[in-house]
Amino acid sequence: MAGMSTHTRRRLTDAPFLAAATGATPSRRPVWFMRQAGRSLPEYRELRAGIGMLESCFDPELVCEITMQPIRRHGVDAAILFSDIVVPLKAAGIDLDIVAGVGPVVAAPVRSVADVRALPRLRPEEVGAVVEGVRLLVDALGQTPLIGFAGAPFTLASYLVEGGPSKHHERTKAMMYADPKTWHELLGVLTDITIAFLRAQLDAGVDAVQLFDSWAGALSPADYRAFVLPHSERVFTEIADAGVPRIHFGVGTGELLGAMGEAGADVVGVDWRVSLTEAARRVGPGKALQGNLDPAVLFAGPRAVEAHARRIAEEADRALALGAAGHIFNLGHGVLPDTDPGVLTALVELVHEL
């Protein structure tokens, strides 16, 4: 990237997460958790006290410390950069904030072609704080891989069009159906922003990336293919030259797994609504799977957690027999805020034995 030096990518000699993601045989079953750095950890709550979410995301030292917390506590096999999917939008100059108890709120929703054409682009220097956070982490993590991430164009579009979180995505779908030309222009802009954000992280040294399409489960397979897939596919194509594993995840996307696999990622994330065995059939051979414990199971006591973890490991082994390239144990969504962190630590130890 112009004006930014590229960090020499680390050589990690024993990284089970990277092995599973690339079709090699890991030394143990790798495990990490979406939202592992967050409100379930008392040390996180203490560190974030009085500091806004977006403010935290633009403080390199804070980003580094928060990202490291679950590595120290749980011994997971990968770190995921502490950030938020709207960070590149905020960095580019879009007026938005993350409101406690609500989520991202956009001051001026995007509703017309003029609104789309007025959207800013993301310049590398605008995410310099994130880049510095990545560099600090690369130095701090030792042999633990670092996953960078971004929100997928569709999910970012939904926030911009709706003005915030939405249950039914009615304004988003209305634009899709009534004005597909404007829709694709909007997603083109957001795809450029997503690529720029991921490229900045890759140039700074992340070892893998995950694209979060949080709201894609609101779409039918036909609509996903027509209105979303080409843009997500472009994201994965544009960053392929970095040579790191690319993960694709959405919530409620069981019916979309085949299409999501076609987008070009190396790993497809699976939520708890579809077994890993069935996911392997839908995604097809040659791609690793990630998931898929229901986060609510962590509230059900140690026997239930162990039973479900063993079931998932067995389903994953069947998925491997069907042609899946690997398995990375994870939840089917993020860690819930009231989760007992001790349960997560015990789960990591169990998964490493399975």
Curated annotation (Swiss-Prot):
Primary localization: cytoplasm
Gene Ontology biological process: protoporphyrinogen IX biosynthetic process
UniProt catalytic activity: uroporphyrinogen III + 4 H(+) = coproporphyrinogen III + 4 CO2
Alphabetically ordered keywords of this record: Cytoplasm, Decarboxylase, Lyase, Porphyrin biosynthesis
Site residues (Transition state stabilizer), renumbered to this chain: 84
GO terms for cellular component: cytosol
InterPro entries cross-referenced by the UniProt entry: UROD/MetE-like_sf, Uroporphyrinogen_deCO2ase_HemE, Uroporphyrinogen_deCOase
Gene3D superfamilies reported in the protein's UniProt record: 3.20.20.210
GO molecular function per UniProt: uroporphyrinogen decarboxylase activity
EC number(s) recorded for this UniProt protein: 4.1.1.37
Keyword Repeat part of the UniProt annotation: no
Sequence similarity: Belongs to the uroporphyrinogen decarboxylase family.
Name the record gives this protein: Uroporphyrinogen decarboxylase
UniProt source species: Nocardia farcinica (strain IFM 10152)
